Design a protein with these regions (language model features):
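Generic secondary-structure signature for well-ordered alpha-helical cores
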Residues: 165, 240, 291, 295, ...
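Polybasic low-complexity intrinsically disordered regions
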Residues: 178-251, 256-269
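Short, flexible loop/turn motifs enriched in small residues
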Residues: 21-24, 200-207, 351-352, 379
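Dynamic "connector" segments at or just before major functional cores
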Residues: 1-189, 198, 210-222, 236, ...
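An anionic, glycine-rich sequence signature occurring as long contiguous blocks
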Residues: 276-375
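Short, conserved catalytic/metal-binding motifs centered on acidic residues
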Residues: 28, 114, 129, 152, ...
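A C-terminal functional module that forms or caps the active site or interfaces directly
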Residues: 338-418
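Conserved beta-strand -> loop -> alpha-helix junction used to position metal-binding or nucleic-acid-contacting
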Residues: 46-49, 269-285
């Protein structure tokens, strides 16, 4: 539809003109994701005012009060500028907006972008996000309009409480799938983590099962469970969307289930499971075999490590002849090897020895098995410890509605973006501070392109 020049000059970004007789009404609009039609749909936010050839723009309510303005419109037409792009907002910004359409002043993109940049730069709560937005408004306006300034802490709080975490998780996975394509064989660790201060009244603390690439050191996805014991039900759901073809999936004893093992094999992946006493006599049979039957020279590898006045020795034995074990436990037909790791630690003259046992669908050397298992152990230092000590995940008191879950995912987005640009000698917490000080560095982090 062609609009007259006198009406078009009052049209602003994210608005729409609608003809009313010899005048035009101006509405602010946005778009929302429609899950039924699987596309975005236009949504009217609010009536801004009317436009006539004689009087120009008349803001909503002024005509009712008998006031007809003269001069320029109070709604300034922003200059035509090329806004900068980020690699993640295309995937995250089309979230279904659950807020009431009345009085909405900030788009989904503006709130998400403010919160993410704030978290990257060290923000931990709603007030931090608001203060960051006010301080860095000129920087943020390089990416989005922010016609009403930075979102307040109450705006962020209401928005994140209402976001559908399931939809947000899926958009996170879509983004990370484009950001980091895993081509060569590597270890994918699945392990749970609790945010201990996220409880509130009857609402239990948040427990997330995280999927972590041990080589690229990025989070591939996550799944919320009500408590740690429910990891068993969460892992099969994770494996539904996780591409494990050609990779090694490592899971601790909680997830050592033959149904999970079969699911990984069906998806053309391999597994290494830690053994404990949750599978009947399986753990006892493997332990007894290593204690009485194994030759100390058969498929053996030893690794030494010395640092901080601590000497660690790890010995690994792997047995490929496991036909006897699959006959005793017919549900576990996918087992192709068993392993034992002896960890000896010497600290200031005190020596401790620990034994761990594993089952696997791999037929690899002891060295490869040990390296893969150590990759799984690294999830504690490379992910969980960083989330607690650098993002203060364990101390977060965001606890109402869906906000703990959604903010946990947002911290994962920030973690991945920082992980992709940090050097070996940099710490994540130091890099967060530097992003807050140096806008060029922050720009390089959020402009990280898909591979």
């Amino acid at each position: 539809m062609a609009y007259p020049e006198w009406a078009l000059k009052h049209k602003i970004k994210n608005s729409e003109l609608r003809k009313r007789g010899n005048q035009y009404a101006l509405y602010s609009i946005t778009s929302r994701w429609c899950p039924e039609k699987k596309r975005t749909k236009k949504v009217t936010l609010k009536y801004l005012g009317s436009i006539s050839e004689e009087h120009g723009f008349i803001p909503a309510g002024m005509k009712r009060k008998g006031k007809i303005p003269t001069g320029e419109s109070p709604y300034k037409v922003p200059p035509e500028t090329d806004l900068k792009e980020t690699n993640f907002m295309d995937d995250l910004a089309e979230l279904n907006d659950e807020r009431s359409a009345r009085n909405i002043e900030h788009s989904v993109s503006e709130i998400l972008f403010t919160a993410l940049c704030a978290v990257i730069c060290g923000a931990d709560g709603w007030q931090d996000i608001e203060e960051f937005g006010k301080t860095k408004l000129e920087f943020l306006q390089q990416y989005f309009a922010y016609d009403h300034g930075a979102p307040s802490d109450d705006t962020c709080r209401r928005f994140f409480r209402a976001v559908d975490p399931g939809e947000f998780e899926k958009r996170f996975r879509d983004w990370i799938a484009k950001l980091s394509k895993i081509d060569k064989k590597q270890v994918i660790a699945i392990d749970g983590k609790s945010s201990r201060h996220s409880f509130d009244g009857e609402q239990k603390m948040l427990h997330m099962v995280n999927v972590f690439s041990t080589e690229s050191k990025i989070i591939l996805g996550q799944h919320k469970v009500s408590e740690k014991t429910n990891e068993i039900t969460a892992i099969p759901e994770i494996l539904e969307w996780l591409d494990v073809k050609g990779h090694i999936v490592t899971i601790d004893a909680m997830g050592c289930q033959y149904a999970i093992a079969n699911q990984i094999i069906q998806k053309e992946g391999d597994y290494i499971f830690s053994l404990k006493g949750n599978q009947g006599n399986l753990s006892d049979d493997v332990t007894l075999y290593f204690e009485k039957e194994v030759s100390l020279t058969e498929n053996f590898f030893v690794d030494y490590n010395k640092e901080h006045s601590r000497i660690e020795t790890r010995k690994c034995w792997v047995i490929h002849d496991v036909k006897w074990l699959t006959q005793m436990h017919p549900h576990w037909v996918s087992i192709k090897s068993i392993a034992r790791i002896e960890s000896t630690r010497e600290i200031k003259g005190t020596t401790t020895i620990e034994y761990r046992y594993y089952i696997s669908s791999l037929q690899e050397t002891a060295q490869t098995m040990l390296e893969s298992i150590r990759g799984h152990w690294a999830i504690e230092n490379s992910l969980h410890w960083v989330l607690d000590m650098s993002f203060f995940d364990d101390q977060s008191r965001i606890r109402k509605g869906n906000a703990p879950h959604v903010m946990s995912i947002l911290r994962h987005v920030a973690f991945n973006l920082l992980q992709l640009v940090k050097t070996k000698r940099q710490s994540i917490i130091g890099l967060r501070k530097m992003c807050g000080w140096d806008e060029k560095l922050l720009e390089s982090v959020i402009a990280r392109k898909s591979s």
